[in-house]
């Protein structure tokens, strides 16, 4: 891993006063961002700059900052959680960006996640998913083996567990092109 350096970035961030107001992208310039800092630390740095300029800081969700809770979910440059794969927004580091880059930051774009303010969305849709069981059940009329009776090799089970470890970030719902499908429990 290379040594941390400072970069200057341009930010285009979704701003929206409340759920009823119309939002828009606003531009910001942020200098001396350490490539060792996390994406959320960069947003903290921007908010500190805005407060010092007597401007309204950007509202964004976060909690654990360890990739456990899913609260930090954002679209970054049009991708859920940004340019890296297999991570949440809080696990994204600024070393993924270059000096002079323009970074677009938006809240989840889904009817299931209405914007409350800026980058903060209403996540109550996950309560409905959990109440619905979070899966689609199929009536097999007793003609198939019970899934619990089918042995699965440990290697396959370990790989499946990694893919199934949901932290409730909502990326699956926010990015699903089939979000209005009748069987889609997240819609």
Give the predicted meaning of each segment.
Residues 1-187:
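Signature of N-terminal electron-transfer/Fe-S-associated modules in redox systems
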């Amino acid at each position: 891993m290379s040594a941390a350096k400072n970069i200057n970035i341009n930010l285009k961030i979704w701003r929206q006063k409340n759920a009823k107001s119309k939002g828009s992208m606003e531009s910001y310039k942020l200098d001396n961002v350490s490539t060792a800092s996390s994406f959320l630390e960069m947003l903290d740095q921007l908010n500190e700059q805005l407060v010092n300029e007597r401007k309204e800081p950007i509202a964004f969700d976060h909690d654990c900052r360890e990739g456990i809770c899913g609260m930090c979910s954002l679209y970054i440059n049009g991708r859920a959680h940004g340019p890296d794969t297999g991570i949440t927004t809080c696990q994204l580091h600024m070393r993924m960006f270059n000096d002079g880059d323009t970074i677009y930051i938006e809240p989840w774009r889904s009817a299931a996640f209405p914007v409350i303010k800026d980058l903060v969305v209403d996540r109550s849709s996950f309560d409905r998913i959990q109440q619905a069981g979070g899966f689609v059940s199929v009536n097999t009329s007793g003609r198939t083996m019970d899934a619990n009776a089918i042995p699965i090799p440990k290697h396959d089970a370990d790989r499946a567990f990694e893919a199934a470890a949901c932290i409730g970030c909502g990326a699956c719902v926010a990015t699903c092109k089939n979000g209005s499908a009748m069987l889609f429990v997240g819609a």
